[in-house]
Design a protein with these regions (language model features):
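N-terminal alpha-helical interaction modules that lie
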Residues: 2-78, 82, 89, 158-207
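Short coil/turn linking the two alpha-helices of tandem helical-hairpin repeats
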Residues: 39-42, 67-78, 106, 110-117, ...
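TPR alpha-solenoid repeat register
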Residues: 60-62, 101, 137-138
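Canonical positions in the second alpha-helix
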Residues: 90-91, 127
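TPR/TPR-like alpha-solenoid helical repeat scaffolds
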Residues: 110, 137-153, 177-188
């Protein structure tokens, strides 16, 4: 007998899941597992409805899974951005110091219309407030993000970005990123200190 293909989540399944999650605190703990299993399978509109319907408190792990799955879709649709924004805000309602969620909100804002609005700027400010340096991945991400909108960033955000460069330069695991940044970043104030911190790597001559 041929094996059956797994069915995609239906509205009825979503209602059952939400009803169960609303039943009590113990059931809410299941949301993280459920979200990770279903985020890739359901459409962005359905997942957005699910994320919005589930009250706080619930699971940071689940909200993070929903946000990451939404932003992994290509090409990104408005519904994907809405889902990632909703899930990120849910994360922050539980953990206001979650730097990844603040970074995501800034990214979503920029992806929405190609420029940072007041909300996106507030999110990147908050990112630096809760984690001025953070782990290497956070710092490298913020430099790359700043590069995308460098000319429109206020001086204090540029300064905060540049202040991370000496720290990144002293971390061995950032080597590959430093090589790429030294060779490819268009802004001298970024690539010059990174090249200086990456011995043996030269920036190709301008053509």
């Amino acid at each position: 007998m041929a094996s059956r293909r797994p069915k995609k989540p239906t509205k009825a399944l979503m209602k059952i899941a939400v009803s169960g999650l609303l039943a009590g605190a113990g059931a809410l703990a299941l949301f993280g597992f459920y979200a990770e299993m279903q985020a890739d399978a359901m459409g962005p509109e359905a997942a957005t409805s699910l994320a919005a319907a589930i009250p706080t408190p619930a699971s940071i792990r689940g909200y993070e899974a929903l946000a990451q799955a939404a932003l992994a879709r290509q090409p990104l649709a408005p519904a994907d951005l809405d889902l990632a924004r909703t899930a990120s805000l849910k994360t922050l309602s539980l953990d206001p110091g979650n730097v990844s969620a603040w970074n995501r909100l800034a990214y979503i804002d920029l992806a929405d219309d190609g420029r940072l609005s007041r909300d996106g700027m507030a999110a990147i400010y908050k990112s630096y407030e809760v984690s001025p340096y953070g782990n290497p991945q956070v710092m490298m991400w913020r430099v790359d993000f700043a590069t995308r909108s460098w000319t429109s960033l206020p001086d204090d955000i540029r300064r905060a970005t540049l202040d991370q460069l000496p720290v990144i330069g002293g971390i061995y695991v950032t080597w590959d990123w430093r090589v790429e940044t030294c060779r490819e970043n268009p802004y001298p104030e970024i690539w010059q200190p990174i090249c200086a911190a990456t011995p043996g790597i030269d920036r190709p001559a301008a053509r």
